[in-house]
Amino acid sequence: MAAAFSSTVGAPASTPTRSSFLGKKLNKPQVSAAVTYHGKSSSSNSRFKAMAAKEVDETKQTDEDRWKGLAYDISDDQQDITRGKGLVDNLFQAPMGDGTHVAVLSSYDYISQGQKSYNFDNMMDGFYIAKGFMDKLVVHLSKNFMTLPNIKVPLILGIWGGKGQGKSFQCELVFAKMGITPIMMSAGELESGNAGEPAKLIRQRYREASDLIKKGKMSCLFINDLDAGAGRMGGTTQYTVNNQMVNATLMNIADNPTNVQLPGMYNKEDNPRVPIIVTGNDFSTLYAPLIRDGRMEKFYWAPTREDRIGVCKGIFRTDGVDEEHVVQLVDTFPGQSIDFFGALRARVYDDEVRRWVSETGVENIARKLVNSKEGPPTFEQPKITIEKLLEYGHMLVAEQENVKRVQLADKYLNEAALGEANEDAMKTGSFFK
């Protein structure tokens, strides 16, 4: 570290040449300092010896450490935009500070919004967790925190099934029951205007969960609707570089879960293993090598009648609906998703809102709701009866049928103006009301 090196200079030291690098001649104090090395001076005609760098403790990082930048992400493409400003033709430059052209100098500047804490009302007693669902999730999470002899445990658990069946909500209940603090991601974060940004975000969120585990807090990475962000939904969607990199990053993490590095740095120390839970509706749209058995354990979630009744009891637990009425409601709409019953409960409050609107006046709604000194309106909990629930349930089913039956887009393409768009209303008798 303290070794000196020689520099050959053609001109004598007494008449130094003009340096194009420094832009000016060396004065005499500079020359005398340059030819002095560890208290020993050389003649003016001898060759220069450069000053040796002072001793630096390599075990401590200081402001003078030339490698300090390795701990930060200096390879960010947004910083490259900043670095290249003024160095390339203006034709290829976007205005700085506009949209995505905001310089982000470090990955650590992305303050994570992924951590989510749960505080449900009567979480364990009031909400139902399906036994099969809980068994699969608890076993997978536990296996990933254990050291099993000669066993390769898949890092990723893929939970897939029909829409609105409560996959994400059931996961949140299990996390809360196990005392897990998940790091959350959604499908919308798996695409970006900058190539490589989603893959970097996955690694960053994974390392955040790893840091929580280091501190003694059980954690996992939870990605909602993976197929919507990284899957191919037919010919109408474009397969981008980010789709490829998201799939490749998840494959790499599944193969090397204890060696996940952030861009711009490399840490030889192993990070704790973090199980990954993903949800989706159709995993056949994902890259096939990602969902192979060694990397992803797959679980198809189709709630049974018992599961549907149990979840619906939790939905109506504060409304005083009798248990036999919940069973009747579930059996009346057997083909509906669990989310249907949550929407059904929300419909019951329509009458209360409608009554408040008539009392307040339509012209006063904005002032009462947005800029009111009295605060937002409060409602007494309406009495929910099985007759009212069945009535609203059939209304929701009718709306679903209308969407499937009245396909106006096809009519607009085939016929002029409205075509026969009002024909459906005439048949149902609601057109002349």
Swiss-Prot record:
InterPro entries: ATPase_AAA_core, P-loop_NTPase, RCA-like, RuBisCO_activase_AAA_helical. Residues 1-60 are annotated as: Disordered. GO terms for cellular component: chloroplast stroma. ATP binds at G161, G162, K163, G164, Q165, G166, K167, S168. Residues 1-53 form a transit peptide. It holds the Pfam family AAA. Residues 1-20 have a biased composition (Polar residues). PANTHER family: PTHR32429, RIBULOSE BISPHOSPHATE CARBOXYLASE_OXYGENASE ACTIVASE, CHLOROPLASTIC (PTHR32429:SF44). This is Ribulose bisphosphate carboxylase/oxygenase activase, chloroplastic. It comes from Zea mays.
